[in-house]
C-alpha cells in the first residue's frame, strides 16, 4: 500500500513539475523585413562585445543598434565590400574582431572605416576559438589564423590520394566544438564527426557518417554530445562516441524529425525544427514540449520554420527563421492577448476591452467594445466567444447567479445573460420609469459586483441590488453632493467597503449599510482616475497629475514624486506589496516598501497599450487582468524582482561635415573649425535588453550648462560658437532612475584666424609699436617745430635789439 502511495505521489509530483514547465510564458521581439532587415531568411546571428547585433541573411549583412538597422551588401566595384551577399556564418574572435563567412570568402570587418577586408577567398562555414587564434572550417580544410603572426596555416581532414578523388562538399565542416581542452570535434556534412587531437595534431573518426546531412552538433554542460541529421531526429552520445539515445517522432514527444539547430538554455535542450517551431527537451524527465506559431495567438512563436538558435553573452536566446527574420525569446510573467477571428479560441473576438469580471474559479468574463462577451479560462489559456452577443459594447459585467450575468450594454441598458443558452433577457431597474431615467437620460448604468449577493448599479443615481431577494435600495450620501456633471464610478471594492470616485473627490461606501461619505478630496483642478487598497490602511490614488496615497490612520494625503509619468489611467495593488500602474500607455510596477519603480516594455510582454479597465476587486488567484485598447493583459504576480542593470554608454562615431572624425580624437578631445557645417555624436548603449528604449540626458558644459533630453542616440551640434565644451551623458534604467553622467568628449571649437589669440596678440603688439612710432614721430616733429620757433623767436629778438641799437646811434 505504501509503495503504491509513493508511486502515486511521485507521478503526481512529476505531473505537477511537467505542467509547471508548460506554464512558462515567452515574449518574442521580432526583427524582419518590416523593421528593415535586408532579407527574411536568417543564416547567422551575433551580438558583439559592444552590444551591436549582427544578422547574416541570404541576401546581405545587417547590424542593429538603437539607431536602427544598417545593411551591408556586396558591390562588384568595391573591393572593401562583402565578398558575397549570402552569409554562412558570423563570429567574433577573442580580440573583438568581427569575421563574416560567405561562399566566396572570409571577410574581416574594419570598424573604424566601416568596411570589410577579404582575408580568405575560399568558402567558410564555421569557426572555433583556440588558444592564440581562431580556426575557420571550409571544405575538407581548416584555416588556422594566429593572432600574433597574423598568418594562416591550413589543416586537411582527409588528404588527397592520387588514385582516389575526394568529394570536398561531403567534407564540408559545418560545426566545430570542444569536448575537452585537448580535443576538437569536427562535424562534416556527410562523412561523420572527426576528433582532432590538439597535442598529436591528428584526426580520427569519432562518430561514423550517416546517410543524411549533419545539421547540428552540440555538447551540453554535463558533457553529453547531441547531434541531428536531416530528417533523422535527435541523437545522444557519451564522451566516447557511443550512442545513448535516439529520439524521433515515433518513440518520443518530439514533433518533428527535421532538426536544424541545437542549443542549451535554462537546463533544457532547445531544438530548432523545420516547420514545427521549437522543441524543448528536458533530459532529467525525458519530456518534450513545444513552442509553436498558433494562428490567432498574438503571443505565440512568430513562425514555425526555425533555422538556428543562438545564445549571446548576456544569456539572451535568439532564433533565426526561414521567412520571419529573427526574434529574441524571453521568459516573461506578462502576457498580452489580442483579437482573432470569431470562435477562434486563441484570441479575443475584439481586442478593445472595456469591462472584466473574475469568477471565484478564476475564469474571467470579458466585455469588449463591439465584440460582445468573451470568456477566458486560465487553466486552458483559451477563449470562448459568444456569437449571439457579437456587435455589443459590454460596458460592465457582474454575476447574478451561477447561471446568469448582469451586463450593461452601451445605449441599450442592462440585461441578464444566460451562460448556457447564451441569450439575453431584459432587466429593469426598479420600474420602467426609473429604468428609463437611469439608462437613457445621458448616463451609462454600470453594474459592479461588490459582494456575493450584492451588486451596485451606478448611473444617474446609485442603487444596491440584492441578488437573493431581488430588491433595490437607493444608496444614501451623508450630505448633498453635486453629481450633475457626471456619475459616480466604482474604483475599488472588498468585503468591507468600496471606493467611489467623482472628479477630484474620493468616497467611502460601508458595505453594511451602503452609505456614501466623503473620504478625501484634492484640488479641483486634479482628477482622480483610479484607487486601490493595499490592506495596510493605505488608499493608493492615481490622478491626472501623478501618484499619491491617503493614509486612513493619519487622514492625510501624500504624493509620490517621480518623473516617469504624470497621468495615471489605472492602478491596482497586488498581494505581494506592489502597485501596478498604467500611465501614458506604459506599464510600471512600484515596490511600496522600497519606493522603487520598474518599467515594463514589449520585450517583457507589455506592448504599448491604453488601459481602459482594471477589475476593482483583488483576485484570490495570482493574476491581475487589465483591459486595454490593444487587448487583454495578464500579469502573474509571482513575477520575480528584476535586478537593475546599469547600461554601458560609449562613443561609437563622430561625423564632422558628414565625414568620420573618430580617429582624430586625442586625449578624449577633438578640435573643430569655427565654420563647420555639421557635427554629430553617435552613441552605443550596451545592455541585456537591446530593444529597451533609453531616455538620454545630454549635458553640454561651457560658460553655461545646457540640458537636452531625447530618445535619439545621435546628438547633433550644428551651431557651437568658438570655445571649449564638455559633453556628458546619462540614461534611464529599468527602475526609472538615471545613471551617473559620464564624460563623452571634449570639443574645442577654434575661432577664425582673426579671432585667435596669436593674431590678437600680434595685432596688439603692432598697435603698440605703431602708436609708439606715431607718438615718437609726432614728438620729434613737435620738438623740431618748437626748436624752429625758438630760433625764430630768438632771431626776432636779436633783430629787434640790433634795430634798437641802430636807431640810438647818431648819424
Residue ranges of model-derived segments:
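Carboxylate-rich, polar loop motifs that coordinate divalent cations or form catalytic acidic clusters
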Residues: 1-750, 755-777
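A short secondary-structure junction motif
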Residues: 657-658, 800, 804
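Cytosolic signal-transmission helices at domain junctions
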Residues: 773-802
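Intracellular C-terminal tails of type I single-pass membrane proteins
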Residues: 803, 808-811
